[in-house]
Amino acid sequence: MEKFLTVCAALILTAGMWSAEPETRKIALTFDDGPHPVYTEEMLKVLEQEQVPATFFLLGENAEQYGEQVRMIAEQGHLIGNHTWRHVQVTSLPKEEAEEEILAVSSLVEELTGNGTSYVRPPFGIWDPELEEKLDMIPVLWTIDTLDWTTQNVDRIVEKTVQDAGENDIILMHDSYESTVQAAERIIRRLKAEGFEFVTVDQVIMD
């Protein structure tokens, strides 16, 4: 009888292991340098189709020119971040000018969408911690650089990203190229199939 109970317990435990829900791994898709008058909208269509949230780090000079695309990003529920006004290395500027590069974008985003932004991606990944304290902005870098701006080879972009992907990674892309739109769609599908859950960067860095 004791042996029978032991076997039953083992079978129940094994069944529980097989039926348990697999844990999802969070990953964030981010886009720099937008908005683009054509490819931002194409990217938004892909994200809507795949039901995936993303984070867009906008350049002020582009956001000013393509305000409708900024509103579309916000209306679809994506997170908007700051990428300075002119894509400049903030540490190369006088403090006041560096501050204005960031504040001007935040002000414009709030004007266009009704909400400001707390997140900044410094161009070239170079940041000044003093700006973080003074402007109360949270810098967001990346862990996977797709290098999508260097090639139109969609396969190369996809394979590099999927091979490097891990839990809580932040993927850097640019919504300025047709090849990036195509690659993003395939990356999303591949990583979903591997059990990844796409989230906005705030859910990764605050995890």
Predicted regions and their residues:
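Serine/threonine-rich low-complexity intrinsically disordered regions
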Residues: 1, 40, 176-179
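Short non-domain terminal segments
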Residues: 2, 29, 54-55, 194-196
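Active-site beta->alpha N-cap acidic-glycine motif
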Residues: 14-93, 97-98, 108, 116, ...
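Sparse, context-dependent recognition of short Cys/His-centered cofactor- or disulfide-binding micro-motifs
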Residues: 2, 58, 75, 150, ...
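Catalytic domains of cell-wall/extracellular-matrix polysaccharide-remodeling enzymes
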Residues: 64, 88-197, 202-207
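Sec-dependent N-terminal signal peptides of Gram-positive bacterial secreted proteins and lipoproteins
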Residues: 1-16
